[in-house]
C-alpha cells in the first residue's frame, strides 16, 4: 500500500499564513498613517488589499487541504493497523 503524501509542505503553509498576516499588518499601518489619500497611496491600498485577498484565499486552501490530509492519513493508518492485526 502506498503511503499518502501531504499536498502542502510546511514551508507553503507558513508562507500562506505569513502572506495573510503581512497584508493585514501593512494595511493597518497604512490606515493608521492615512491623513489624505493621494494617487500613490490609493495604489498602495489597492496592492495591499490584493495581498490580503490572496493571503486569505491561500490560508483557506491550506487549512482545508491540511484538514483533509489529516483525515486521509488517519484512515490509511487505521486500515494499515487492521491489516496487521488480521495477518
Swiss-Prot record:
- What GO CC annotations are associated with the protein? plasma membrane
Listed GO biological process terms = DNA damage response
Domain of life, per UniProt, equals: Bacteria
The protein in question is named Uncharacterized membrane protein YubF
Segments passing through the bilayer? 10-30, 43-63
Bilayer topology? Multi-pass membrane protein
InterPro entries referenced in this protein's UniProt entry, alphabetically: YiaA-like (IPR038972), YiaAB (IPR008024)
Q: Which Pfam families match?
A: YiaAB (PF05360)
**Which species is listed as the source?**
Bacillus subtilis (strain 168)
Q: Which gene encodes it?
A: yubF
Q: Which UniProt keyword terms apply here?
A: Cell membrane, Membrane, Transmembrane, Transmembrane helix
User: Where in the cell does this protein reside?
Assistant: Cell membrane
Amino acid at each position: 500500500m502506498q503511503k499518502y503524501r501531504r499536498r502542502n509542505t510546511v514551508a507553503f503553509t507558513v508562507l500562506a499564513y505569513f502572506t495573510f498576516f503581512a497584508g493585514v499588518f501593512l494595511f493597518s499601518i497604512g490606515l493608521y498613517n492615512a491623513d489624505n489619500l493621494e494617487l500613490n497611496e490609493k495604489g498602495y491600498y489597492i496592492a495591499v488589499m490584493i495581498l490580503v485577498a490572496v493571503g486569505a484565499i491561500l490560508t483557506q486552501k491550506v487549512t482545508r487541504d491540511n484538514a483533509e490530509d489529516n483525515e486521509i492519513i488517519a484512515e490509511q493508518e487505521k486500515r494499515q493497523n487492521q491489516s496487521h492485526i488480521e495477518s
